[in-house]
Amino acid sequence: MLQPTEIERLLVVMAHPDDVDFGSAGTVATLTGAGVKVTYCLVTDGNAGGSDRTVSRADVAALRREEQTAAASVVGVTDLVFLGHPDGRVVADLVLRCDISRVIRQVRPQVVMCQSPERNLDRIFASHPDHLAAGNAAVSAVYPDSRNPFAFPELLEEGLEPWEVNEIWLSAHPVSSDFVDVTEHIDRKFQALRCHVSQLPDPDGMEQRFRTFMSANAVTAGFDEGTFVEGFRVVQAS
């Protein structure tokens, strides 16, 4: 796993607003605090989120974009891209792969952080079908698409040269290979999560559950008790 001093730019690709904050906001805060430029790429606007049928889906999408932008600022991220694919219907097709490849070539990151394309049966809520599809498309965009000059020639016509990503960090993978100690930034993680007001009917309960989960993972991974970690399956891509 590359260290913050070895990373200049990192691209986060997630299916929905709030996904990065649940899984990785502590890591993002750690990286931005070390001077890494982080960009968020959200595949959908999250317009299928929530259960209030009196609110239009367009209004939900606008609200969730605002919530994600606010949450991003808490952890030092100001560069966000919303791809606008339909929430609940994400498909890892060539259209999405091209869209993500475009962002990779624009950002030119050393690391792409995305959701695991493999279902985690121990954490089924982290394996929403949109998450799996977004992860699948992001991994395919890293290899082979974004580095291949003959994949999506329209990107060359846009002036976007191929780019080779060094590592992929998969969140919510069934098996984590590496862990980031986010204890110093744990409060900022939950401050970011609390920006997603429309999705959190019980923010206090959510925070307690995640603190318990993250501290238990830390002990299992060999960290001192009282430490909080976020886990990733790191894939070498170059």
Placement of each model-derived feature along the sequence:
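Metal-dependent de-N-acetylase/amidase catalytic core
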Residues: 1-11, 93-238
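Active-site rim/loop-helix segments in enzyme catalytic domains that contact anionic ligands
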Residues: 1-108, 233
